[in-house]
Amino acid sequence: MNYLASLAGLALSVLQAAPALAKEGDTLRPFVAYTRNYDSNLYRLAKSEQVPGLKLSDQFEVLSAGLNVDWQPGRQRVIASASKNWVRFSRNTHLDYSGSDLQLKWSWRLGNHWSGQVGATESATQSSFSDVSLPINNQVTRENQFADAEWQFHPRWHVGLGTARSTSTNSTLQQAPSDYEDASVSATLGYTTPKGSTLRGQLRRVDGEYPNRSPSLFVDQAYSQTEYNLLGDWNTSGKLVAHGRIGYVQRENDTLSQRDFSGLNGRLSADYFPSGKTVLNWAVYREIGNTDDFNASYQLSTGTSLGGAWLATSRLTLRANATIENRSFEGDTGVVVLGTPQRDEDSLTGSLSLSYAPVRMATIDAGLQAGRRDSSIDDSDYRFHSVFVRVQAGF
């Protein structure tokens, strides 16, 4: 791990030069960052699952470097970013890995009535241990390509079409059955109010498959999903911005109809700016989604979150956030596992962080997070707390 710290020290030694290198309006903005982390329960295991000799707590460091691009030729805009990170653990060295994040988006305009976006993303990172409590180094590569176009046929009305394709690939054989591919198409009809708020009706169709799954009586290899959504964005005043989505989702599996599900989805979020130095964020949601549990065909997630940021001085920012969520695993698959009820889980997480900008192009962040999950399945309970310190410089 020492070589990462040495590289980080070399990069961060140019902090004082950062203001001279970066200029307002620069199209290209390179950056480098170094983060030191501690986690008390790395694998998110319950006490009953803890194995002697397994190193649950650990410190790890992350060295990141990348480039952000924001180019605006005329009425067009191209936003791109590329970053690479190296993660090294103190005790669980078998988890060491190198990740990446690539993004490219072109926001285009043609005349006064046509606009849209074309883009692609790719990321490689370690999978979460929250639901797969295996001490293995599984890396997930996610790719996404998308394109959409919108025609404003009236000062208040517009229609749009979009398409997207996504893939997710796991690096280990144990997680290969979770690999998936999906393709989607969508159509929208929108209305803009005189004050700038928008309402949109959306019809979306998704076809997906799990290419590495063998035929099974418990999980399917392919599905089709249809969504009917009503979307809204409101700017009610100079201090309040809100976003809403309510819809109905219907999922049909290729062969196992007992795993089909349908239901209501919804999310409401708002940003409130009581002053020029403070922002509050709030969200509440109800979302239905797929699960691979043998005795449940879907999971229903309901929750709320509250966060805020306070600019204490021109250099110092304080942030806090709390989230409460319930996940209920429901649906009759026809499979009964004796002694294993359907999962029902309550999660609570909270975080607090402080950000200091000693010079314009550099920040120093420190924070802590704590959380717990209580489940109807004893082995799915866990507790954790974590701490981090991060230094980043832009050039």
Regions found by a protein language model. Give the residues of each.
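Cleavable N-terminal export/targeting peptides
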Residues: 1-25
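Gram-negative and organellar
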Residues: 21-395
